[in-house]
Amino acid sequence: MSDKIAIIGGSGVYDLFKKASKISVKTPYGKVETIKKTKYKEREIFFLPRHGPKHSVPPHLINYKANIFALHSLGVKKIYATNAVGSIDISIKPGDFVVPDQIIDMTKVRPLTFFDGSTTIKFEDGSSRKGVVHLDYTEPYCINLRNMYIKAVEDIGEMVYTKGVYVCSEGPRFETSAEIIMYQKMGGTLAGMTTVPEAILARELKMCYSTLCLITNFGAGMQEKITHEEVVEIFEQKTNQVKEVMKKIISSEHSSVKCNCIS
């Protein structure tokens, strides 16, 4: 149980870390001052609120590179994210849990890589990555962490969709109804704003990454007007379940089966 793990999320899991200490991490991409650190038995656990204190940073302005690099510099090997997302599949309803297995990137202006041609990043095992780096994203989420999430949700008695295609848009606005129709035709099932570039950057730094999505609304044109208040309300209704899932994750032994994340 020695692997350091990180949880990236929002208020739904923040209360798990009341006794944690707050730390600040300097990175080449900026300082990250919102990380909280705690310990369960021999495992170090870090929590990073991606939107900053009091949900103050919109998705398109999050310093994703600083966030992920900070966790890397702390020795984190596994990242468990949580997301509030919209459903663009009528069979997946608000209140449902989904552990997605695929991503469609529809972002526009976010930095998507650490490797700009001149960057060198060194790893604990003595290896390094530098220059122009082309990585395999056939499976953008770690299969081992996905299985951990699926088992944890099932263990608390909740139903979980074990696959889904997360369409990540720029935000902070919600999508148009025409965009939702396009995403559906592309094979998307979920609409969100933050898994890109988190999953991409984590893979570049040889960290395993998966996310647990909670459906908070249907996509534009599938219901009446979407509001942020509605999203918050649904998430708050499931806060206890999200916390129980994270407790299961924190206290569980993690798979030693080799995945594609560190190759």
What are these regions (language model features)?
Residues 1-137:
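Metabolite-binding pocket within alpha/beta catalytic cores that recognizes anionic/polar moieties
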Residues 193-230:
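Zn-dependent metallopeptidase/amidohydrolase metal-coordination segment
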Residues 68, 180, 196-199:
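Generic hydrophobic/aromatic pocket-lining and core-packing "Φ" positions
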Residues 220-263:
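His/Asp/Glu-rich mid-to-C-terminal helical/loop segments that flank catalytic regions of hydrolases
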Residues 136-185:
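Active-site rim beta-loop-alpha module in soluble metabolic enzymes
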Residues 72-75, 184, 203:
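Non-catalytic positions within long, well-ordered alpha-helices that form the structural scaffold/packing
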